[in-house]
From Swiss-Prot:
This is Large ribosomal subunit protein bL20. The gene is rplT. One of its GO terms (biological process) is translation. SUPFAM superfamilies: Ribosomal protein L20 (SSF74731). GO terms for molecular function: rRNA binding; structural constituent of ribosome. GO terms for cellular component: ribonucleoprotein complex; ribosome. Keywords: Ribonucleoprotein, Ribosomal protein, RNA-binding, rRNA-binding.
Amino acid sequence: MPRVKGGSVTRQRRKKIIKLAKGYRGAKHIQFKVAKQQVMKSYQYAFRDRRKTKSNFRKLWIARINAAARQNDISYSKLMHGLKLANVEVNRKMLADLAITDAAAFTALVDEAKKALAAE
């Protein structure tokens, strides 16, 4: 039997990889072999960073809460401990949003935390 080189199937497969590599610099968006390696590495970065995003947002929320808490003369850790003692179940995402958009509500929560800490 004669050898079959792949023809349209190979071309389609390579075109797909080159299309995924659009926007890459240098040979990485032109040459199939290099483009394939870079696309695979890009998938690895994407997989890793989808998980990293969660911790990055948590760090951002904590930084925002801490900044707003210190304006109200309390540290982040004491605020969180006070809220726990006061049985206030507000997550960090909501606290950070309150700290930015509704300072009065955030101050009320800080006062609750301070009362709970004083009663301890």
